[in-house]
């Protein structure tokens, strides 16, 4: 449980393991249930296009997300994958939603073992492919 008392649903954990171990999904978007007591799966996708994932993030509401980010390593070293955790809190979301999502994040983040990078986004430019790639490159030492 988090500081806000929010729990992570079994469905949320299963979906993550399906993404991480089974490669069943490319992305998962999580939300708080209506009672704000549990983090649940909002949607999953097998779509490879990163732009499609970003388009699934709501313009005016908060979400958590996980994306299996694939990128090219320089000097012809091939492709790599990192599981990226997103805390999506757009500037246009209500202050209450931002506060509840911020105080509940740790419960989900701690439950998801195997996250390579964490991204906090308040607008779409912060979750753009190039921005995320730059952060991954900094954290892995690839340039």
Swiss-Prot record:
Entry's family note: Belongs to the actin-binding proteins ADF family.
GO CC annotation: actin cytoskeleton; cytoplasm; nuclear matrix
CDD domains the record matches: ADF_cofilin_like (cd11286)
Domain of life according to the entry: Eukaryota
Entry-linked SMART domains: ADF
Pfam families reported for this sequence: Cofilin_ADF
Gene Ontology terms, MF aspect: actin binding
Domain ADF-H residue range list: 5-137
InterPro entries: ADF-H, ADF-H/Gelsolin-like_dom_sf, ADF/Cofilin
Subcellular location: Cytoplasm; Cytoplasm, Cytoskeleton; Nucleus matrix
Main location, first listed in the record: cytoplasm
GO biological process: actin filament depolymerization; cell division
Annotated function: Controls reversibly actin polymerization and depolymerization in a pH-sensitive manner. It has the ability to bind G- and F-actin in a 1:1 ratio of cofilin to actin. Binding to F-actin is regulated by tropomyosin. It is the major component of intranuclear and cytoplasmic actin rods. Required for accumulation of actin at the cell division site via depolymerizing actin at the cell ends. In association with myosin II has a role in the assembly of the contractile ring via severing actin filaments. Involved in the maintenance of the contractile ring once formed.
Protein name per its UniProtKB record: Cofilin
Native species: Ogataea parapolymorpha (strain ATCC 26012 / BCRC 20466 / JCM 22074 / NRRL Y-7560 / DL-1)
Keywords: Actin-binding, Cell cycle, Cell division, Cytoplasm, Cytoskeleton, Nucleus
């Amino acid at each position: 449980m988090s500081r806000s008392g929010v729990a992570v649903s079994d469905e949320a954990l299963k979906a993550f393991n399906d993404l991480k171990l089974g490669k069943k999904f490319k992305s998962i978007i999580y939300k708080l249930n209506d009672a704000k007591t549990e983090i649940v799966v909002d949607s999953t996708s097998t779509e490879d296009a990163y732009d499609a994932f970003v388009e699934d993030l709501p313009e005016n509401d908060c979400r958590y997300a996980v994306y299996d980010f694939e990128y090219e390593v320089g000097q012809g070293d091939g492709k790599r994958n990192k599981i990226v955790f997103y805390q999506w809190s757009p500037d246009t979301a209500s202050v209450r939603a931002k506060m509840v999502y911020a105080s509940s994040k740790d419960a989900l983040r701690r439950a998801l073992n195997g996250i390579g990078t964490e991204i906090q986004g308040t607008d779409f430019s912060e979750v753009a492919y190039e921005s995320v790639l730059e952060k991954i490159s900094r954290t892995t030492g690839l340039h």
